[in-house]
């Protein structure tokens, strides 16, 4: 199997931009690998602890907290894995408003406090699989998206649930500088079918490791769908709308032959530039202890979600 390089798992234009940024900073290309995440630990203790129902016992080995908060894709804060922790540390998430609108009987707005107290919070230990063929295990805290959907009371026209990330170029340097933010047409947009949104695995997360989400992980609220590639799990959400028509999502618009609408984890459907048959596990060890493991269909959640796609050709609808 081909050994993946950073240029393999990143769209070519964005990788070349990243090289240019790193070079202008006087850093070596080796910086593009697993980052030095010591700086990510500085703010861990400052995050507010949450009250939640603990997860049931899991056999999954958790990825250490400092790696979860120090190795991220959040292009609004830069395309390098270490950039979000560095450039999001002063990101202001309070005050915040999450607008619920569209084809619903009950549109509403949640403020920052209401994100944490409107619905009972619970812990979910989920596998997290990036489309770049690396994975983690994360102890998320949040509530089922289905609870919010039920409160909104979608009409019979609502076929899709559409999410928008905050657009704030003054706080998000990747939105202000196309070179720094991967030339994405912001704000970041994602969407699900209404059936996917109602699945009990679909989580709106407000925390991890017992505390509020760090900014680089999508504070104050993000989507988590453990059977899909990570780019579907949109961060720092300010708007959720219900639509009759399917929108073009951000990565689908950028590279439709590489990043599909459904983005289900599927070891039998390779990315055009690399295999999805296995993944690099980011665990407790250092660089020399990083291991590869076979990728599971739907990331190991086949029993819970396969029925959603029984009438789809997953090689076409990837």
Curated annotation (Swiss-Prot):
GO terms for cellular component: periplasmic space. Binds 1 Mo-molybdopterin (Mo-MPT) cofactor per subunit. It catalyses: L-methionyl-[protein] + a quinone + H2O = L-methionyl-(S)-S-oxide-[protein] + a quinol; L-methionyl-[protein] + a quinone + H2O = L-methionyl-(R)-S-oxide-[protein] + a quinol. Mo-molybdopterin binds at residues 72, 75-76, 130, 165, 217, 222, 233-235. Residues 1-40 form the signal peptide. It is found in: Periplasm. The keyword Metal-binding applies. GO terms for molecular function: metal ion binding; molybdopterin cofactor binding; oxidoreductase activity, acting on a sulfur group of donors, quinone or similar compound as acceptor. The keyword Oxidoreductase applies. InterPro entries: MsrP, OxRdtase_Mopterin-bd_dom, OxRdtase_Mopterin-bd_sf. SUPFAM superfamilies: Oxidoreductase molybdopterin-binding domain (SSF56524). It is an enzyme of class 1 (oxidoreductase). Predicted to be exported by the Tat system. The position of the signal peptide cleavage has not been experimentally proven. Its EC number is 1.8.5.-. One of its GO terms (biological process) is protein repair. It holds the Pfam family Oxidored_molyb. Keywords: Metal-binding, Molybdenum, Oxidoreductase, Periplasm, Signal. Belongs to the MsrP family. Part of the MsrPQ system that repairs oxidized periplasmic proteins containing methionine sulfoxide residues (Met-O), using respiratory chain electrons. Thus protects these proteins from oxidative-stress damage caused by reactive species of oxygen and chlorine generated by the host defense mechanisms. MsrPQ is essential for the maintenance of envelope integrity under bleach stress, rescuing a wide series of structurally unrelated periplasmic proteins from methionine oxidation. HAMAP family: MsrP. Heterodimer of a catalytic subunit (MsrP) and a heme-binding subunit (MsrQ). This is Protein-methionine-sulfoxide reductase catalytic subunit MsrP. It comes from Haemophilus ducreyi (strain 35000HP / ATCC 700724).
């Amino acid at each position: 199997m081909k050994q993946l390089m950073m240029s393999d798992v990143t769209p070519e234009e964005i990788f070349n931009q990243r090289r240019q940024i790193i070079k202008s900073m006087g850093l070596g290309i080796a910086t593009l690998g697993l980052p030095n995440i010591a700086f990510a630990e500085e703010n861990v203790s400052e995050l507010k602890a949450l009250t939640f129902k603990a997860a049931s016992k899991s056999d999954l080995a958790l990825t250490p907290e400092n790696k979860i908060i120090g190795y991220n894709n959040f292009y609004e804060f830069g395309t390098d894995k270490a950039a979000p922790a560095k450039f999001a540390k002063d990101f202001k998430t309070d005050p915040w408003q999450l607008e619920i609108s569209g084809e619903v009987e009950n549109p509403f707005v949640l403020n920052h406090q209401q994100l944490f107290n409107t619905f009972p919070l619970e812990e979910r230990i989920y596998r997290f699989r990036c489309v770049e063929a690396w994975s983690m295990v994360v102890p998320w805290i949040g509530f089922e998206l289905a609870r919010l959907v039920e409160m909104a009371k979608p009409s019979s026209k609502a076929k899709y649930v559409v999410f928008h990330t905050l657009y704030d170029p003054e706080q998000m340097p990747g939105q202000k500088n196309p070179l720094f933010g991967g030339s994405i047409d912001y704000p970041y947009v994602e969407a699900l079918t209404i059936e996917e949104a109602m699945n009990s695995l679909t989580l709106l997360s407000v925390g991890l490791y017992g505390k509020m989400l760090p900014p680089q992980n999508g504070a104050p609220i993000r989507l988590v769908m453990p059977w899909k590639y990570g780019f579907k799990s949109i961060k720092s959400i300010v708007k959720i709308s219900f639509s009759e028509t399917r929108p073009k999502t951000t990565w689908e618009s950028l590279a439709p032959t590489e990043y599909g609408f459904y983005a289900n984890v599927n070891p039998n459907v390779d990315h055009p530039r690399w295999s999805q048959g296995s993944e690099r596990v980011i665990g407790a060890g250092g660089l020399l202890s990083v291991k590869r493991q076979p990728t599971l269909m739907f990331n190991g959640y086949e029993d819970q979600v396969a029925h959603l796609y029984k009438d789809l050709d997953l090689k076409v609808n990837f």
